[in-house]
Regions:
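Acidic-aromatic/histidine active-site loop/patch
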Residues: 1-3, 255-262
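Walker A/P-loop phosphate-binding motif and the immediately C-terminal alpha-helix
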Residues: 2-40
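Active-site signature of alpha/beta-hydrolase-fold catalytic machinery across serine-
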Residues: 21, 25, 47, 135
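Conserved catalytic-core segment of NTP-binding enzymes
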Residues: 28-34, 115-116, 120-209, 215
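Phosphate-binding loop that captures ATP/GTP phosphates
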Residues: 41-81, 208
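Cytosolic-facing regulatory segments adjacent to core modules
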Residues: 83-130
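C-terminal boundary of histidine-terminating zinc-finger modules
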Residues: 221-239
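C-terminal alpha-helix
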Residues: 242-254
Length: 262
């Protein structure tokens, strides 16, 4: 399996939406895709038609000792969804303490699913530094850092790079990091200027295109689905497809170590 951790040092960059739509594109291309939510907001499921009143998820399953197979949902576009789940505050803290104490928890749990070498796991994480992001990076084959074309995102890049260097880069099976610029409005001069700076700074690590700002993204979420499913001919949908092709060209070139295949 290949594990893609979708991360960001700051909130409000559209990370969950990007993770959902990339998972959707990959699934429609014939890959088996697991969309795994490691964010307590439990929002990734909303893109895949998981019932709003469902409380099941990996947090509750882990605390109760249940197998993850029991909380896997068949989502739209053929994506298998592993929600975070709904837990009370005390249980959330217990869950966080557990995964902080068990750094191999995520990788071992994924291996229990007996995924094939070609299967893809897309992990959504909370913004910034957290036990969830650290856990995802400890299991990741590749990290995808989502940024905006603004000064705040530019300034936050070193923070996430330090986390990747600490928790992912030392592993021999980690294949590197990529960057994608989301919610781009090409009519703004500042956006164009920041894009130039990001391309100079990040070079080949940066997806050569962008994800354009598109009202269809919000509309698709309101319909409990992905943009790829809701409006496949939109500009952002084309961007997601191009980004997924670039992403998989990077990920598929990474050798899979024997220990990373269940």
């Amino acid at each position: 399996m290949k594990v893609i951790a979708v991360v960001s040092a700051k909130g409000g960059v559209g990370k969950t939406t990007l993770a959902a739509n990339l998972a959707s594109v990959l699934a429609t291309s014939g890959r088996r895709v697991i969309a795994l939510d490691l964010d307590p907001q439990n929002a990734l499921r909303l893109h895949f038609g998981v019932p709003l009143d469902s409380i099941d998820g990996l947090s509750r399953a882990t605390l109760s000792g249940d197998a993850w197979q029991s909380i896997m949902f068949d989502g739209v576009d053929g994506v298998t969804v592993l929600p975070y789940g709904a837990v009370v505050e005390d249980d959330r803290r217990r869950f966080e303490a557990y995964i902080d104490h068990e750094p191999q928890w995520l990788l071992q749990s994924l291996e229990s699913l007996r995924l094939d070498a070609s299967d893809i796991v897309v992990i959504d994480t909370p913004p910034g530094s957290s036990v969830y992001t650290r856990t995802a990076l400890c299991a990741a084959t590749f990290a995808l850092n989502v940024v905006l074309a603004d000064a705040a995102s530019y300034a936050a890049i070193p923070q996430m790079e330090r986390m990747i260097d600490a928790y992912a880069a030392p592993r021999p099976d980690f294949g590197g990091v990529g960057y994608v610029v989301n919610q781009v409005d090409q009519s703004r001069q500042l956006t164009k200027d920041v894009l130039k700076v990001l391309r100079h700074l990040l070079g080949e690590k940066l997806f050569p295109g962008v994800i354009h700002q598109d009202e269809g993204v919000s509309e698709s979420l309101a319909c409990d689905t992905t943009l790829i499913h809701y409006d496949p001919l939109s500009q952002a949908a084309a961007d997601f497809r191009a980004c997924s092709q670039w992403l998989m060209s990077r990920v598929d070139s990474i050798a899979v170590s024997p220990g990373s295949v269940a």
